[in-house]
């Protein structure tokens, strides 16, 4: 499958086809996923994609310009696939197709818009876009099941930690990352992974979003040391590219639905680990 075929299949997809994709991807994830933390091997390059929010045009641009189909590179999506953008249904179909066809190269993280029960978001127009395209409520119900199979975080050992929002402020072991979903809602680890934001403070404060926390540099330093990573890469904010905590944190957004610039990143995992300032210079803005 090449990109042109994928775009055509996505635009012409039917209810039966997307339900089939979901079923096939769930089977893949059942075999692949041992816990909430994906371990990515430090081979080849890794394409990093932030929030998409139904922005099919930006997703296609990234796949084309990163040359995903012409290489053995891996790609990680940091969550928030639907809502806000009118092509949310198509974005889901395309991502499911990528995972089905390239299971070992595609990593899908959970964002706050792929919420567990009790952490619902607003606005949430994904059900509308799915029903409009596929004339069915069943697709949305299956998509919600798919969310529960997504990774909460990913790690390239000794190099990079990936989450959608941020790192839990009271995290005491890597096992709590691995079991974030199982511990929810008794523990707030999953909520914070999906909702937290970095800021230039020392410790942490409750988030003005109403869920999660705002975390400071000391939290970042503690968690990166704990999981044996050097740079945190996350999304969750429509900033294009931003650096926090003296180069320890990189925020990347890959959607234009907010009217802002978008970006993606391609990291050579076989090279020396880069800090967020160095990664920001490598990012492709569009």
Question: What spans do the regions from the language model cover?
Answer:
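Feature recognizes metal-dependent phosphohydrolase scaffolds
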Residues: 1-286
């Amino acid at each position: 499958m090449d990109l042109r075929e994928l775009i055509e299949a996505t635009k012409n997809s039917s209810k039966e086809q997307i339900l089939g994709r979901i079923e096939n991807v769930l089977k893949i994830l059942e075999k692949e996923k041992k816990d909430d933390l994906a371990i990515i091997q430090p081979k080849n390059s890794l394409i990093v994609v932030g929030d998409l929010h139904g922005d099919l045009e930006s997703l296609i641009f990234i796949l084309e310009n990163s040359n995903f189909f012409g290489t053995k590179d891996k790609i990680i999506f940091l969550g928030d696939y639907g809502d806000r953008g009118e092509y949310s249904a198509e974005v889901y179909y395309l991502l499911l197709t990528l995972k089905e066809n390239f299971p070992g190269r595609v990593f899908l993280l959970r964002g706050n818009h792929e919420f567990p029960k009790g952490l619902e978001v607003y606005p949430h127009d994904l059900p509308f876009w799915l029903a409009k395209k596929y004339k069915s409520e069943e697709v949305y119900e299956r998509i919600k099941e798919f969310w529960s199979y997504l990774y909460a975080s990913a790690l390239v050992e000794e190099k990079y930690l990936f989450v959608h929002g941020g790192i839990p402020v009271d995290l005491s072991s890597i096992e709590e990352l691995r079991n974030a979903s199982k511990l929810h809602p008794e523990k707030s680890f999953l909520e914070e992974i999906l909702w937290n934001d970095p800021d230039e403070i020392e410790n942490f404060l409750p988030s003005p979003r109403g869920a999660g926390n705002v975390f400071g540099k000391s939290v970042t330093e503690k968690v990166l040391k704990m999981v044996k990573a050097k740079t945190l890469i996350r999304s969750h904010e429509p900033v294009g590219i931003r650096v926090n905590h003296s180069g320890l944190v990189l925020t990347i957004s890959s959607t234009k639905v907010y009217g802002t610039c978008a970006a993606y990143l391609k990291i050579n995992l076989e090279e020396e680990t880069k800090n967020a300032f160095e990664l920001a210079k490598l990012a492709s803005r569009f």
